[in-house]
Amino acid sequence: MASTRSPGGARTLLACASLLAAMGLGVPESAEPVGTQARPQPPGTELPAPPAHSPPEPTIAHAHSVDPRDAWMLFVKQSDKGINSKKRSRTKARRLKLGLPGPPGPPGPQGPPGPFIPSEVLLKEFQLLLKGAVRQRESTEHCTRDLTTPASGGPSRDPVTQELESQDQGAVLALLAATLAQSPRAPRVEAAFHCRLRRDVQVERRALHELGVYYLPEVEGAFRRGPGLNLTSGQYTAPVAGFYALAATLHVALTKQPRKGPPQPRDRLRLLICIQSLCQHNASLETVMGLENSSELFTISVNGVLYLQTGHYTSVFLDNASGSSLTVRGGSHFSAILLGL
């Protein structure tokens, strides 16, 4: 059966195989002249087959061939540059996502109130602050004394600190006042007094009476500092010019009940503290009290601030503008203190 095959069919199959091999090797079209096409071999002519052991001859197609994979990778790398860069795209996308700032939102709800701090806790914190201030002040004074006097004895606790730790809450405030009074920044009171009326004084009706004959009580809280007080005349002369706080309190007893009937406009008392005994011409402190609803024993007081020149005196006057006499009881007091210049 093999001998019956025609040699023309074999040659056709061999030509097709050669064409497929040429296409597999990537023979470019530019290797042939333009306009020429591969023509099949005419029948009857057979190309000699190359030996099997000989290596393939080099062709021009290998010098001009391009690997499809390398071309694709080069295209991918070049596509990430320029306008197609991923960094530029991300930045642009972020800018677009931010957009324009909108209006501020409404305020949030109010927070819960803070914790309630009882007064006991606040007082304890105040005590701690006071202890620190006292310790700092005492240590400063101790260092100052060490610079001027030799050291003596071993270290001992401050008496002010010991007293502070042993006192209760009420004593802490008293200690604070004492510390402020002892502080060099607290001004010293140069003039002050507190005196009382020695005996009862009779004041007739429709009369203006200047009170006198005082004494200095020997009780806790009584004070006298500086000159100027005349206990006999009841006049206090200002040792220096300045502002003085003055006060007077009288205990008054009616010796005779006022006449019956409707109260009269003149049935009243005036308590005054005058300068130079000129109550009408100079500034004075005054209190007015009606007698229509008063009892047999009552109290009338006056207080305020006057500016006194050096050498000017003040005194207490009682104006009995009523229809009956009265008595100012002993123990009524008169006081003054220099506030400042």
UniProtKB/Swiss-Prot annotation:
Quaternary structure, per UniProt, is: Homodimer; disulfide-linked. Forms trimer, hexamers and higher molecular weight oligomers. May form heteromeric complexes with C1QTNF2 and C1QTNF12 and, to a lesser extent, with C1QTNF5 and C1QTNF10. Interacts with BMP5 and BMP7; the interaction inhibits BMP-induced transcription of HAMP. Interacts with BMP6; the interaction inhibits BMP-induced transcription of HAMP. Interacts with BMP2. Interacts with heterodimers composed of BMP2 and BMP6 in vitro, the interaction inhibits the heterodimer binding to its receptor BMPR1A/ALK3 and thereby suppresses expression of HAMP.
Output one GO BP term: establishment of localization in cell
User: Which residue windows does the record flag with biased composition (Basic residues)?
Assistant: 84-97
Q: Which PROSITE patterns match?
A: C1Q
Out of the domains of life, which is the source? Eukaryota
**Ranges of Pro residues compositional bias?**
40-58, 101-115
Q: How is it modified after translation?
A: N-glycosylated; required for secretion of the mature protein.
| PANTHER family to which the protein is assigned, alphabetical | ADIPOLIN, ERYTHROFERRONE
Where does the protein end up?
A: Secreted
Report keywords, A-Z.
Disulfide bond, Glycoprotein, Hormone, Hydroxylation, Secreted, Signal
Modification Hydroxyproline, positions: 101, 103-104, 106-107, 109
- Tell me the first and last residues of the signal peptide: 1-24
Q: Annotated site (Required for correct protein folding in the endoplasmic reticulum), which positions?
A: 320
Q: What does this protein do?
A: Iron-regulatory hormone that acts as an erythroid regulator after hemorrhage: produced by erythroblasts following blood loss and mediates suppression of hepcidin (HAMP) expression in the liver, thereby promoting increased iron absorption and mobilization from stores. Promotes lipid uptake into adipocytes and hepatocytes via transcriptional up-regulation of genes involved in fatty acid uptake. Inhibits apoptosis and inflammatory response in cardiomyocytes via promotion of sphingosine-1-phosphate (S1P) and cAMP-dependent activation of AKT signaling.
Q: Which residues are glycosylated?
A: 230, 282, 293, 320
Q: What is its main location?
A: secreted
Give the region (Disordered) as residue ranges: 30-65, 78-115, 137-165
Gene Ontology CC, one term: extracellular region
Q: What sequence ranges are listed for the domain C1q?
A: 186-341
Instruction: Give the protein name, as stated in the record.
Output: Erythroferrone
In Gene Ontology terms, what is one molecular function of this protein? molecular sequestering activity
Q: Which family does it belong to?
A: Belongs to the adipolin/erythroferrone family.
| Xref: InterPro entries | Adipolin/Erythroferrone-rel, C1q_dom, Tumour_necrosis_fac-like_dom
Disulfide bond recorded as keyword? yes
